[in-house]
Amino acid sequence: MPNRITATTAFGKGEVMDIEHRVKLGGRIHSKGVLILTAYLASVLGKTAQIPLTTYLTFEQSYSGVDGDSASMAECCAIISAISEQAIRQDIAITGSMNQFGEAQPIGGVNEKIEGFFDVCKIKGRTPEQGVIIPASNMANLMLRKDIVDAVAQGEFHIWAITHVTQAMELLLGKTAGSLPQTAAPSQGQYSPESIFGIAQQKLTALRSLVKTD
């Protein structure tokens, strides 16, 4: 069954508080995944100044152990959503690991995860916009049920295969992720103001200004 991941932010020092780890429900591989996505976020939003927020990350209504890194991309997208205050689509599921550069990495159980979300969609009510984001490197592992294959073929369900977490952000938040100009020095680099990273950058810059004023 799908899990719901949420992230909230408060004034802090750029840390990601892994609630599962704090209450001893998270395994070491999951904790490593959280540290890796923290490093990625610092590299895109904290090159020249500390991110002045602490993020609290959790699996909602999960009361058993959590391990593995297959939720890393989902957690990263949840954090970016919280920082930028841009809502995430709730009709798309995502699974996949990521490295410090944001590159998508394969995970296990991809068929079961897709089938689980598809079945939940059937129970809650199917719409043609629903689907699952997976790492492109898992495409060779797909052996899905016929009803799912048929739904995908008819455009009634979607499987998006991605190579980078920014592609997931764009699908989930409905905006371009943004990139820094290649010619810009790190201290002068600005993301497009309409992009996901640009919106997040503006909010962090405003918060840093308040901190300096105080």
Walk through the language-model features, giving the residues of each.
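Peripheral, non-AAA+ core regions of ATP-driven protein-machinery
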Residues: 1-25, 29-214
